[in-house]
Amino acid sequence: MANILILGAGAMGTAFSFPCSDKGHSVTIIGTHLENNFIDQINLTRVHPILECEVPKKVIFLKLEQLAEQINSKGKIDLIVVAVISKGIEWASTELGKALKNEIPILILTKGLAINDNNYEVLAHKMERLMKKNGIKETNISAAGGPCLAKGLANKIHTSVVFANTNITVAKQISKLVTTDYYHVFTSDDVVGVETCAAIKNIFSMAIGASQGLCHPST
């Protein structure tokens, strides 16, 4: 059994707790600074208002002020999962930079691309750069990509994803933690390729869908 901490109590962060819980892991979800009321509501009803389903009984929901305590004081955390919106990566990097004292593997579920010095930057590289600015010398960050919808994952609909890390061994270790009979994980050492495809896939799907629609009468 592993101890997994998820930063972000939104749809995808909570949905990711389902395969983690099904594998028997201890899962703690820490809300962002904007999710305090959200956390109170979930703890009261045990229903996630966006996913519209009950959350696993063993998953613990806590507020942001308990982040450092959970990381450093309550046993060993084996994996930190970042599940915030793309604009929140800088915030998450700062919060983790303040809380982390030891190197812990990090998995980013967030999709998107950033700009740094007029160049595109994948989010794993952005987080590495920002955390080093915050004094974290060694980082071990993996990125997830794939057509995975939060509600589908929470309802255990089959889906396939890719975990990428320049150290393929780390990606494989994380995949073993969370792979289930409905959440299928492949691995890659191409972080830039996986993150870029994850960020722009919807552009291509919209273009393909629109071109197919041109063959049909307007309704």
Question: Where on the chain are the PLM-derived regions?
Answer:
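Conserved residues at beta->alpha junctions
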Residues: 33, 83-84, 165
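Internal alpha-helical scaffold of NAD(P)-dependent oxidoreductase catalytic cores
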Residues: 99, 130-140, 158-219
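NAD(P)+-binding Rossmann beta1-loop-alpha1 motif at the extreme N-terminus of oxidoreductases
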Residues: 1-54, 59-66, 116
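Rossmann-like NAD(P)(H) cofactor-binding subdomain of soluble oxidoreductases
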Residues: 61-62, 66, 74-157, 174
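Generic structural signal for well-ordered, non-membrane alpha-helical segments
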Residues: 9, 13, 35, 89, ...
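Structural signal for hydrophobic packing residues in well-ordered secondary-structure cores
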Residues: 11, 20-21, 46, 50, ...
